[in-house]
Amino acid sequence: MGQKSNPIGLRLKIINTWDSLWYANKDYTTKLHEDFLLRKFIKKAFYHASISKVVIARKVDVIMVNVYSAKPGVIIGKKGADIDKVKQQIVKMINNNIELNIIEVKKPELKAVLIAENIAQQLEKRISFRRAMKRSVQSCLKIGAKGIKVSCAGRLGGAEIARTEWYKEGSVPLHTFRANIDYGFSEAKTIYGIIGVKVWVYLGDTKSSNE
């Protein structure tokens, strides 16, 4: 039986690169756990800022954190008050100097993580899963995606038995390595239980970094 691998991990060093840009020897596990903590903290602190990814690069005396957000104003706050507050909390948490950069995501409708989070938020507001999926798919294709596939799994519509529903438009070639496919996952916490939302977005073919 075929298994679905993560399209981003499958294409690392072909068309994608890592979100953690550093090398470590003895204290690798410590730094890895720090990265997990940083991402979890930033995502939680700015839940409504539509964060697509957090890239962490480590230098000798400073950690550079690039936050890609569709709503940078939510993170920065009035006169940068919110971002300074978060910086202080992170420094206290990991005991290291930090440089926090906010990068705006120009087309959030094409980011799989943001699409998944948007669908999850709609499901939490009791909007029909079919309507939420269809709306997100149409807006994604309108912006310029070549194809999109969405799955919702769980007690959909409050059903007794959990099931998985799919919605697909266009082509999503998961087995083509040069295909630029973005993948995102989110969870909707409803009164019936958790519903998992997965999104694959095909943005067209890309030349590999080795060519």
From Swiss-Prot:
GO terms for cellular component: cytosolic small ribosomal subunit. SMART domains: KH (SM00322). Residues 38-106 form the KH type-2 domain. One of its GO terms (biological process) is translation. One of its GO terms (molecular function) is structural constituent of ribosome. Keywords: Ribonucleoprotein, Ribosomal protein, RNA-binding, rRNA-binding. Pfam families: KH_2, Ribosomal_S3_C. CDD domains: KH-II_30S_S3. InterPro entries: KH_dom (IPR004087), KH_dom-like_a/b (IPR015946), KH_dom_type_2 (IPR004044), KH_sf_prok-type (IPR009019), Ribosomal_S3_C_sf (IPR036419), Ribosomal_uS3_bac-typ (IPR005704), Ribosomal_uS3_C (IPR001351), Ribosomal_uS3_CS (IPR018280). Belongs to the universal ribosomal protein uS3 family. Part of the 30S ribosomal subunit. Forms a tight complex with proteins S10 and S14. Binds the lower part of the 30S subunit head. Binds mRNA in the 70S ribosome, positioning it for translation. This is Small ribosomal subunit protein uS3. It comes from Ehrlichia chaffeensis (strain ATCC CRL-10679 / Arkansas).
